[in-house]
Regions:
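Conserved beta-loop-beta element that borders a ligand/cofactor-binding pocket
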Residues: 62, 86-106
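Proline-centered loop/turn at the N-terminus of a beta-strand
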Residues: 56-57, 93
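Short active-site alpha-helical segment characteristic of glycosyltransferases
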Residues: 83
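Active-site helix of classical SDR
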Residues: 79
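Canonical Rossmann dinucleotide-binding motif of NAD(H)/NADP(H)-dependent dehydrogenases/reductases
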Residues: 1-18
Length: 111
C-alpha cells in the first residue's frame, strides 16, 4: 500500500497493492514549513494509518536533519522526530528512513 500522491510515492507505485508493506509518503515535504496545521495533518494521518494497518511494515521517510546540530531545532525537524517517536511507540514493524535531499534541485521550493 502507498499513502501519498507526490514524487516519492510515485517511485513506490509497484507497492500500491501490497498487503504487507505500507509506504507512507504523504507528509510535510518542505523543510521550511512552520504551519502547525500541516504538521498536525501528517500526525493524524500517521496515527490513523498505524491503527488501521497494525501488521503491515510501516515505511516512513524522515530527515537527516534530526542528527544535524544546526538544523535539529527547526519546527520541521522537531515534527519529524515526533512522528518517528509515534511510530516507534505504536508499531513493532517499521522502517524509518532518515534521508537527506530526496527531491534534488528544483523539485521542492525549499531547495
Amino acid at each position: 500500500m502507498v499513502i501519498g500522491k507526490g514524487l516519492i510515492s510515485s517511485v513506490f507505485s509497484n507497492y500500491i497493492d501490497s498487503e504487507d508493506i505500507l509506504i507512507f509518503a504523504s507528509g510535510v515535504s518542505d523543510s521550511n514549513e512552520t504551519r502547525i496545521s500541516e504538521f498536525n495533518r501528517e500526525l493524524e494521518l500517521v496515527r490513523l494509518s498505524l491503527s488501521k494497518y497494525p501488521t503491515m511494515l510501516f515505511v516512513y521517510f524522515s530527515t537527516y536533519s534530526i542528527d544535524h546540530i544546526c538544523l535539529n531545532s527547526r519546527p520541521y525537524t522537531k515534527h519529524k522526530l515526533n512522528i518517528e517517536n509515534l511510530i516507534q511507540e505504536n508499531s513493532s514493524n517499521y522502517l524509518i528512513c532518515r534521508l537527506s535531499n530526496i527531491v534534488g534541485a528544483g523539485g521542492n521550493s525549499s531547495n
